[in-house]
């Protein structure tokens, strides 16, 4: 399954949104909001060690391979953010208190405690908005192509 950056994501220059498969393929669109535990360059340090970043607090381990297989079986496109949900949770409303968690499960997230407004805004603009814009663009394109 080929991987590309979604055109809508390029508008923000984030490059943190991934599209795999044909945008107009199949009858479904597969989303995997918690696919990655990555903290991309430019987003600072969350104050967690590597062991914590491998835990469920940072992502849903195994979700991306399952989503890829489901997309392959259905011939559907797959869209996901290539950044940890600890930076910003793309599966929450942007104004939800837990969209940027100060703690997850039993673990404080030092890099999210007393987060400066400009840092949060950079996460929204670099991850959350491009991901949701990419989904909107994909669905709009599928509708125009008669694939929705």
Question: Over which residues does each language-model region extend?
Answer:
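N-terminal catalytic or cofactor-binding beta/alpha core of small enzyme domains
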Residues: 2-148
């Amino acid at each position: 399954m080929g991987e590309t950056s979604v055109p809508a994501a390029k508008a923000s220059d984030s490059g943190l949104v991934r599209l795999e498969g044909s945008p107009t393929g199949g009858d479904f669109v597969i989303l995997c909001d918690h696919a990655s535990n990555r903290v991309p360059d430019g987003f600072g340090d969350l104050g967690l060690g590597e062991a914590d970043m491998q835990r469920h607090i940072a992502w849903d381990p195994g979700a991306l391979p399952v989503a890829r297989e489901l997309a392959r079986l259905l011939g559907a496109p797959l869209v996901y953010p290539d950044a940890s949900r600890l930076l910003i949770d793309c599966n929450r409303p942007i104004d939800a208190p837990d969209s940027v968690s100060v703690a997850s499960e039993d673990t404080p997230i030092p890099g999210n405690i007393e987060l400066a407004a400009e840092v949060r805004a950079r996460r929204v603009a670099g991850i959350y908005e491009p991901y949701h814009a990419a989904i909107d663009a994909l669905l709009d394109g599928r509708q125009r192509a008669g694939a929705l």
